[in-house]
From Swiss-Prot:
Superkingdom classification of source: Bacteria
Site (Important for 30S binding): Y107, K110
Assembly and oligomerization: Monomer.
Name assigned to this protein: Translation initiation factor IF-3
HAMAP family according to UniProt: IF_3
A single MF term (Gene Ontology): translation initiation factor activity
Length: 179
């Protein structure tokens, strides 16, 4: 065979004959402390039970080893990590753009969308854009942001409220209230 590679599996824990310590601190199947024993004795005990000797903490002095079924241990570990991933909620920031002259109908539609975003558990970013002469009437922009804030007071908390205009826009960030 030409140019073949030998792929060595790297396990997170050393098992059975891979353990290099002379003496180990041994724990039983149920987690009960057996004590500090010779590696040969520990391997013998694990073979008698038909299980594996797994090095749990290699940096300890002496290394901690446990008698267990290694395949079952890996399965349980992957299962618990999958469960943790399921429980994590990714929070997205949804953006809605307003203008100082946004009419009532458009305002209600945008407010409905904001309510939907917040109920889904996402943060909402309200961007208020100014064009041309609207820059002279920044008070109207602040009034629009205050109106949005007051309309959503039961659903959201204000994470960031602009103190002044940034460029040609003002940005307010809302986070959903915890239930």
């Amino acid at each position: 065979m030409k140019g073949g590679k030998i792929v060595q599996l790297t396990r997170p824990n050393r098992i059975n004959s891979e353990i290099r310590a002379i003496k180990v601190r041994l724990t039983g199947v149920e987690g009960d402390q057996i004590g500090i024993v010779n590696l040969r004795e520990a391997l013998k005990k694990s073979e008698e039970l038909g299980l594996d000797l797994v090095e749990i903490s290699p940096n300890a002095e002496p290394p901690v080893c446990r008698i267990m079924d290694y395949g079952k241990f890996l399965y349980e570990k992957s299962k618990s990590s999958k469960e943790q991933k399921k429980k994590q909620k990714v929070i997205h920031i949804k953006e809605i753009k307003f203008r100082p002259g946004t009419d009532e109908g458009d305002y209600q539609v945008k407010l409905r969308n904001l309510i939907r975003f917040l109920e889904d558990g996402d943060k909402a970013k309200i961007t208020l854009r100014f064009r041309g002469r609207e820059m002279a009437h920044q008070k109207i922009g602040v009034d629009v942001l205050n109106r949005v804030k007051n309309d959503l007071i039961e659903l959201a908390t204000v994470e960031y409220f602009p103190s002044k205009i940034e460029g040609r826009q003002m940005i307010m960030i809302l986070a959903p209230k915890k239930k």
